[in-house]
């Protein structure tokens, strides 16, 4: 069936509305899981300087994440305007954090980039590079912090300190292997399910690691500020890294419950009180997840309304 066929156009409209309704339903379900009275009480009681600093770092983090797609723009060689790339990246990241990688990382990227005129093969390369960049920074930081023994694990926990150090060494070996391939591999092209991927240069790989590592460190700094700076920053960052991989394994949208469980298990007691941890993470979820998601929803609707005009402009420029 031709893409210009009336039935095809109708099917696309129906699917778009079904997707939009599904997003609204997921938002409502997520909102019901949050104790909003406690959230606003926590925010009202926060030190204003710490809260404003945290808000500023949230903005910085989302801007840094936008650089992942700018790296992908350079990697793929597509000509979409940088502001369009940053906007799509912001929308996708906000949806990805709260509604899973399938919705934000994959679904939204394919939807928006295709609406702006990019072919599916290019979008696949953008997504692949973006997710690789994100986890390269994670692997590098986690490797350093786990190997250094910064995270103090309780005796009753699932893994011991030695296992975590071995894991850290393994992660650093992954980084070393990736850099070696980027620097010395002779065969730099690979095809995965019909999609051609090209191994980047070692300088590009270093840029991926640097940008992503800074983003993870900014995320850790947000929680550290909201905890009142009462705990060592690198310990907080290490706990965030542990909770992030736990969230991926459990695979719950927004890691609801996982983030809190890991932070309470590793921080509560001699480091800080359970109430302080819960309050900080409630504020973190509002600032880093929920408010950006609401803004992203508005941006998504605006971008959808302008997509046809922007696509025509992009195709003329290409």
Swiss-Prot record:
Residues 1-13, 72-85, 147-165, 227-233, 276-277 are periplasmic. It is found in: Cell inner membrane. Disulfide bonds: none annotated. Keywords: Cell inner membrane, Cell membrane, Membrane, Transmembrane, Transmembrane helix. The chain crosses the membrane at residues 14-34, 51-71, 86-106, 126-146, 166-186, 206-226, 234-254, 255-275, 278-298. It comes from the Bacteria. It holds the Pfam family LPG_synthase_TM. It is a multi-pass membrane protein. GO terms for cellular component: plasma membrane. PANTHER family: UPF0104 MEMBRANE PROTEIN MJ1595. To Synechocystis PCC 6803 slr0712. This is Inner membrane protein YbhN. It comes from Escherichia coli (strain K12). The gene is ybhN.
């Amino acid at each position: 069936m031709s893409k210009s066929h009336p039935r095809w156009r109708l099917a696309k409209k129906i699917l778009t509305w079904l997707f939009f309704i599904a997003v609204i339903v997921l938002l409502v379900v997520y909102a019901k899981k949050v104790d909003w009275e406690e959230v606003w009480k926590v925010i009202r009681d926060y030190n204003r300087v710490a809260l404003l600093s945290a808000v500023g770092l949230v903005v910085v983090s989302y801007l840094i994440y936008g650089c992942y797609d700018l790296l992908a723009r350079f990697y793929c060689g597509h000509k979409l305007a940088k502001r369009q790339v940053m906007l799509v990246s912001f929308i996708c990241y906000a949806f990805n954090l709260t509604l899973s990688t399938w919705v934000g990382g994959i679904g939204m990227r394919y939807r928006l980039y295709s609406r702006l005129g990019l072919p599916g093969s290019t979008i696949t390369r953008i997504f692949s590079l973006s997710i690789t960049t994100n986890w390269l920074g994670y692997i590098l930081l986690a490797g350093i912090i786990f190997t250094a023994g910064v995270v103090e694990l309780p005796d009753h926990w699932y893994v011991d300190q030695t296992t975590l150090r071995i894991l850290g060494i393994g992660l650093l070996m992954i980084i070393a292997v990736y850099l070696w391939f980027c620097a010395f591999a002779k065969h730099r092209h690979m095809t995965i399910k019909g999609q051609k991927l090209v191994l980047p240069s070692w300088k590009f790989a270093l840029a991926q690691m640097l940008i992503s590592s800074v983003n993870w460190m900014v995320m850790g700094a947000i929680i550290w500020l909201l905890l009142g700076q009462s705990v060592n920053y690198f310990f907080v960052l290490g706990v965030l890294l542990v909770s992030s991989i736990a969230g991926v394994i459990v695979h719950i949208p927004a890691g609801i419950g996982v983030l809190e469980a890991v932070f309470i298990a590793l921080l509560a007691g001699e480091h800080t009180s359970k109430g302080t941890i819960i309050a900080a993470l409630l504020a973190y979820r509002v600032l880093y997840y929920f408010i950006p998601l609401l803004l992203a929803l508005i941006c998504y609707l605006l971008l959808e309304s302008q997509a046809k005009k922007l696509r025509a402009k992009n195709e003329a420029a290409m």
